């Protein structure tokens, strides 16, 4: 009873609506009953929404080929008491690469879609534009391309939908959790979520736009492997459910101080695709061979229950949609549903139902409060080794950073060293510069004099306004003095 009272109090104190739970599954659209049975099952579990895909084909800019199916399935979902969310995006990517797709045409199509379906109050604009399966090209040898190309489509979509009804919710991007950031990769040339958001923010600021791009950010926190526990995330600059703070930081780095809100001033996260695939060996209703690592049904149930509870306790999360309410029969498809292909329920069904019911009463623990980092994340004390004529310095950080490492003549205070090393030209010293790769040690070597000050300026790759200065005296013998660390904060101009 006490726990229930505490949960209710916390829910009231936060002032933020609890996360909605639902499923992202197009099977209902093609079912004989237009999905009516599945939607009733979703509602019985406590789910509140159904996410349905609606693709825009650039070569048929006014077309809506699935209109008859959409009419029936939207009505069936609404009849079951579910809110309907349309997930919209240009497709196929070859028409984007060929220049057939135009932002204004996409916006006009979205406006008509919103007018035709007034009961649909939320639109996701974009689907994994950081992946080549949905947007091409991604990268050149010199620049990130997909974010700057996608930005005008998101802007056009936002403006068009808001022109129909300013109260409609526009959720942007549909970000994939992973990308390799390698234009020379043999396959799947893609962009990490952190770097995609950085590039989208750079495009937005350069565009001069004075309106938002989105009310919320859609993110797909799939695990790197279905065998991963919920709390196992990705290394920077990728991100999973365990790394939502990294996504929030990336949004803040990209948009803080602009007309586009961050999670500090209203933007929320919509986890519109997430799922842990399960072993189906020996089960009826499946064909083909499995092509990815999978987990067992008990582990899936534990992960899903923990996912629901954790999302409910994060005030920045607006929605969670499990990808696949019922399994695909072909094993090369997706098998993460609450129902197996033969229609029998998995243990995850009861686990999700119980967790939704529990969280409907509020968060049983104090909800986490996220605040942006103002310095380079995870910047560590440098390792310093003296040679006869050189100083070797090893640096590491939890994110990518640009380093400037200087040996300044004489003794310096932390403040004076920071001032000198931040200047374009350093008088009275020698410097080296380079990139510090996240979670790896990067070595710099400088020629030294008898007595100097080692000064290091680390600047976050995704936000020049986040910098950390490290200072250490260097004499004939290295003096083991405490490291002095301070951060300087400057928003983007």
Task: Tell what function each PLM region has.
Residues 428-444:
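Aromatic sugar-binding surface patches on proteins
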Residues 354-394, 475-493:
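Short, compositionally biased P/S/T/A/G/V-rich stretches that sit at domain boundaries
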Residues 28-44, 102-113, 192-206, 301-310:
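Short, acidic/polar
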Residues 12-55:
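Boundary/entry segment of secreted carbohydrate-active catalytic domains
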Residues 102-103, 107, 145-294:
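Noncatalytic carbohydrate-binding groove/subsite architecture in carbohydrate-active enzymes
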Residues 391-397, 405-409:
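Aromatic/hydrophobic beta-strand junction motif of beta-rich domains
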